[in-house]
Amino acid sequence: MQYCELDLSGQWLDTVYCEENFSDFVFIKFLNPSQFEEKIYCYTLHITKRTLENKRLLLYYEDEFKKHGHDINELVGDGIILRSCWNPRQ
């Protein structure tokens, strides 16, 4: 898997993991703010273009969570997730 970086300094959202062709799915890595142990979760997004800018990707990501009644600040701040995921590094 290749890595697609998001620069979100000071937030718990850390890394976006992409499929090789960067066209269908991304995996979001979260750091749980209530524990020292690193937790990795994911949410599946559909990417329609192969060359998205990080800012645009984040906006799309926010919209997807808002559709399910979640706010990005709530999600990132409290570690709320829609579904869990495996650790891509394992």
Swiss-Prot record:
**Leftover remarks:** Present with 125 molecules/cell in log phase SD medium.
Mention any one GO cellular component term assigned to this protein in its UniProt record: cytoplasm
Query: What compartments host this protein?
Result: Cytoplasm
Keywords, in A-Z order: Cytoplasm
Name the source organism.
Saccharomyces cerevisiae (strain ATCC 204508 / S288c) (Baker's yeast)
Listed name of the protein:
Uncharacterized protein YOL159C-A
Predominantly, its location class is cytoplasm
